[in-house]
Amino acid sequence: MTAKGELYQTADWKSEKHVPVIECPDSVAADELFEVKVTLGKEVAHPNTTGHHIRWIQLYFKPEGDKFAYQVGNYEFCAHGESVKGADEGPVYTNHSATASMKVKQPGTLLATAFCNIHGLWENTKPLSLK
């Protein structure tokens, strides 16, 4: 069995196009809705072609002190220019970006994972505190 650390890659999102970027307030009020946006290629654009694309993003929240994380959302991107005419000839492309509206009861950590069809699994985290 391969350890999680060997499957998932991470790096500074400012220099690596595969790292999920988690955008939300650093601190939120308990039980109040806020938005979390997860994107890839914020500083360095990631290709979105039939041959090289982001297939999905998943977002989790791990409450402080809890053993387990809770899935917030699963976002699939299924159109990458595929067509009967050939690769990159299709009429539609989905952008690898997802937004979730959520609320939390306690502080914790947001975890975003993403899958590139060429370069595998990537992850990033962001701490979330309460006001």
How would you label these PLM feature ranges?
Residues 115-125:
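Short acidic/polar inter-strand loop motif in beta-rich domains
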Residues 51-73:
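Extended low-complexity, serine/threonine- and proline-enriched intrinsically disordered segments
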Residues 1-29:
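Short, compositionally biased P/S/T/A/G/V-rich stretches that sit at domain boundaries
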Residues 33, 107-111:
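Extracellular Ig-like/FN3 beta-sandwich strand-entry sites
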Residues 70-87:
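Solvent-exposed serine/threonine-rich low-complexity stretches and specific carbohydrate-binding patches
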Residues 98-106:
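Short, hydrophobic beta-strand segments
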Residues 88-99:
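Aromatic sugar-binding surface patches on proteins
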Residues 39-50:
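Short amphipathic, basic-aromatic surface patches that mediate peripheral association
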